[in-house]
């Protein structure tokens, strides 16, 4: 269903605006929210990253004054230019970037420093230069073997207050053997190199671990990636069919039922996306305008042959 011509909506941080969970809320409280809200248009955002599929349902506004105060900042989906992982949207972008470009055929490394090679306290530039030299060594070894340059995402971490030493998390494609990958790091011999392991959330667990660590130097460049990685795919719609072959209905017409009966969300989503398996969903609200934000996660259904191949694999951990 097309939007009316001239109808422009403002970008705002709906996750910050709607941050109160609906879990265990009494029915009378939910009904009270329905009675005090205004009419609004809801959008549905589909984010595809690898085999992970996220759904975000949120109200849209034409004026920032209509948005809850907590969400009155401009929200950008593509935060590749934002290298500060203290920013929540940058962390989400890195998680999705990893899911889109890597799998259990690839490698996750944690590279550390011995005392002789430890960068000075707070000198993030020195630490980043070390990891950039490492990437150049990797690419030299790959070129010798007729391989293209590495695909990677790296995160640099450090916290002097918590006595956490400099270290780098690197997710890299698995074309080069793990022994060579580890030997190219010259700053320490005590490192971890392991094959990635996906689960129902893809690589989100690992990605969230490396970006959420509380060991960051504020306002410094924290992460980077190789050129040519695929961006997560994002699509925004304002209507869906209740089931295959049905008529399109506005997204807002589904919201009340999802909020009142949260157990209905999996069935609704399975009808919208029959090729996906449901993982989880959460409903949030804000009493500023008595409106809702729904976040759900699904994953592409694997063929039986893919499941057999996955369960037959072995993983090495060092």
Where are these predicted regions, by residue range?
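Right-hand nucleic-acid polymerase module
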Residues: 1-164, 174-318
């Amino acid at each position: 269903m097309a939007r009316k011509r001239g109808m422009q909506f403002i970008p705002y941080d709906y996750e910050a605006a709607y941050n109160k969970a609906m879990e265990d809320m009494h029915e009378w409280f939910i009904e009270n929210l329905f009675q005090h809200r205004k009419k609004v248009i809801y959008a549905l955002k589909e984010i595809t990253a690898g085999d992970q599929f996220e759904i975000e349902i949120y109200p849209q506004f034409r004026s920032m004054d209509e948005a809850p105060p907590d969400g009155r900042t401009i929200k950008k989906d593509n935060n590749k230019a934002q290298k500060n992982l203290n920013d929540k949207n940058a962390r989400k972008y890195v998680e999705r970037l990893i899911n889109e470009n890597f799998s259990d055929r690839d490698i996750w490394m944690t590279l550390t420093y011995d005392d002789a090679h430890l960068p000075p306290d707070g000198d993030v530039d020195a630490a980043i230069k070390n990891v950039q030299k490492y990437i150049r060594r990797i690419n030299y070894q790959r070129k010798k073997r007729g391989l293209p340059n590495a695909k990677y995402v790296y995160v640099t971490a450090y916290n002097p207050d918590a006595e956490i030493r400099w270290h780098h998390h690197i997710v890299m494609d698995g074309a080069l053997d793990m022994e060579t990958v580890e030997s190219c790091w010259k700053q320490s011999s005590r490192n971890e190199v392991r094959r990635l392991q996906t689960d129902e959330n893809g690589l989100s667990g690992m990605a969230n671990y490396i970006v959420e660590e509380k060991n960051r130097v504020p306002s410094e460049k924290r992460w980077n990636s190789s050129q040519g990685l695929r961006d997560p795919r994002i699509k925004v719609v304002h209507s869906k069919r209740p089931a295959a072959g049905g008529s399109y209905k506005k997204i807002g017409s589904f919201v009340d039922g999802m909020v009142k009966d949260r157990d209905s969300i999996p069935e609704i989503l399975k009808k919208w996306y029959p090729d996906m398996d449901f993982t989880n969903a959460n409903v949030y609200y804000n009493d500023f305008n008595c409106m809702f934000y729904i976040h759900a996660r699904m994953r592409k259904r694997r063929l039986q042959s893919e499941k057999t191949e996955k369960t037959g694999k072995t993983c090495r951990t060092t």
